[in-house]
Amino acid sequence: MRVKANSKILALIVPVLLSLNSLVCANPVQEDMSAHESLPAAAAPAEVHAPVEVHNAAGTHVETAHESAVEGHEEKAGDVIMHHVQDSNVLAFEPFGEIELPHLQLGSLDISITKHVVMMWVAAVILILVGAAAGAGVKKISVKQAPSGIANVMEALVDFIRLDVAKSNIGHGYEKHLPYLISVFFFILVCNLLGLIPYGATATGNINVTLALSIFTFFITQIAAFKELGVGGYVKHLTAGTHWSLWIIMIPIEIIGQFTKPVALTIRLFANMTAGHIIILSLIFISFILESYIVAAAVSVPFAIFIYLLEIFVAFLQAFVFTMLSALFIGLATAHESHDSHELEASGHH
């Protein structure tokens, strides 16, 4: 049992250590130190430290060499953090090198392949392989047998989305929207987790990706509402059952509300996935900025590992929240007043 526990702990810590190794290899502070050591001896007299005093005769503050060096390290650490979070046309595999992705131009439209596009392709391939493996595992067992392994995990997640997300929020006719909800849940989940492995990137930390997913939810919601309610029912739904004298107020408010929902979905997923990575990298770079192994051992690494484990939970949580809100928006848009009243009457009779 102790060996199994140790192996589980190593399985959690090794990816973090690999990520730290890649960051150390790209550490700008070490590059500055090596460049300083490689200067010729003749240039040494030019490196004169600023005076120890922090105030001159007039009483104004004089910036010391140490302060300027720390500020320079902070700026370069910030550049590295933003480079990791932002999208780019380069796949970096420090210390092994990098891969330049092709630049594609369609007229004035830039359709270049970026690292976030590659991560979405990887997520799609992973989902296809995992889905095929789970399907093969289910086919091999009989009706009386329970699935095991990856098939058991996938069945549990799919049943959770089907019953607790789709059916409970959409109600009648939820089966039509179940494929989209399952697909968007697993796609967001895998994209979130890919950003936590070495050399990976979080595609859902790109606001363009989250906006595209939110637009899918918006159009599916509106199309489902028109099909379910019709044009007259859709307009009546916008008035929210109010008196006609209030329509001039209610209709614009409801129309604005239809567009603010995808905006909320976009910003919520983007902000949560970006913030976690910035916090992890900021904690790691504290030791580099202060140039202290004590700080790294006592603060940076332990807190970074804690946030890393928390981000695994956040990856599942944000995939669930996006899927839940998508199902909720679809359910609100397609709700029938007659169905609701019949359900209330039926519950009252029971």
UniProtKB/Swiss-Prot annotation:
One of its GO terms (cellular component) is proton-transporting ATP synthase complex. It is a multi-pass membrane protein. It comes from the Bacteria. Residues 1-26 form the signal peptide. Its main location: membrane. This is ATP synthase subunit a 2. It comes from Chlorobaculum parvum (strain DSM 263 / NCIMB 8327). Belongs to the ATPase A chain family. Key component of the proton channel; it plays a direct role in the translocation of protons across the membrane. F-type ATPases have 2 components, CF(1) - the catalytic core - and CF(0) - the membrane proton channel. CF(1) has five subunits: alpha(3), beta(3), gamma(1), delta(1), epsilon(1). CF(0) has four main subunits: a, b, b' and c.
